[in-house]
Amino acid sequence: MMIPPRERKPRQKRITGFLIRQLFLMLLATVSMQAQVTLSDWTQIQIPPELTGNQFSPTRMAVNFFGDLYLLDEERSLIARLPADGDNVRIAGGWGETDELFTSGSDLTAAPGLDVLIVDSDTHRLLKFDRQLNFLEELNLLSTDRPVEFPSAVVRNHAGEVLVASDSEADLTLMNMSGTVISVMGGENYGTDRFVDINSVAINSINEIGLIDSDDRYLVLSRNGRMLWRGSLNMELKFIESTGNEWLVGTAKGEFFIVGQDSQAEVLQESLTQWTVSDMAVGNDTVYILEEGSGHIFQAQLRYAE
């Protein structure tokens, strides 16, 4: 039997009301999020003389679980460890193509675990050091199951697997330290989600992968490369780090945003940065930024309002 049109109206109202309520809750969640995350005042970290001036010019940075900072000098092919207590600075590396030497270090990672990894772009190698920067081993990325040319970024997940970005192919290769390839992500089979220009890569506590691609978009994938979600901001994004269940993305101007699957909000800062950021790292809710040119390092605390 046909239902008269007048009997359908209450149901339509209920559906419309439900949708409006859901949209309101989503908006409320976003607004709440915007008010929850702030950054404390930036403070400068004192750097020993041997890591300044004509001796060392950091261009990339990483931090481990203990708060030790690792600095990469691409021009001089050097890596330095600045312990959390500021004592016993160590410098390793040097120009060369074997063992701890490298010619064009493009990225480094220090967490999770105690090891430090560097990718050397021109020699297509992955170098492994211990926490004190004693050289352990190297892996020729051209000799793996699926060769990786000109590595540009490296991160390590909590299972001990390594994710390496290729500058020539604009893809990500997940492998173990023996060189066995587990999966390759971001190629032609990703269709419109195919990677174009990988700027930054990070991994969170549940081994999800976050990356900045083509400046303005961020993508989140599962450990095996399945696309989980994506988003974009109308600005040039350069950095991504994990924080809790969400992601912190940043620009070279020192603007930061907390992004999730259904939300994005600017991180309010008590004091705005006045410098150009060349790299960013996050450890234990502390954000570290490296100033381009001077090599100065600043830190601030992420604060979450209850």
Language-model features: where?
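Beta-rich, blade/repeat-based domains predominating
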Residues: T52-F65, T98-P112, T144-H158, Y190-S205, ...
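Short loop/turn motifs that cap or connect beta-strands within the blades
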Residues: I47, G93-W95, N140-S143, G186-E188, ...
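A short loop-to-beta-strand structural motif that recurs across blades of beta-propeller domains
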Residues: L78-A80, R125-L127, D171-L174, R217-L219, ...
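Conserved beta-strand positions in repeat-built beta-propeller and related beta-rich domains
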Residues: L71-E75, I118-H124, V164-A170, N204, ...
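Short loop/turn segments that connect beta-strands within beta-propeller blades
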Residues: P83-D87, D130-N134, N176-T180, S222-G225, ...
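A short helix->beta-strand "capping" segment at the edge of beta-propeller domains
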Residues: Q36-Q55
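Bacterial N-terminal signal peptides
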Residues: R21-V31
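Blade-level signature of beta-propeller repeat domains, shared across WD40, Kelch, NHL, RCC1
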Residues: W275-E306
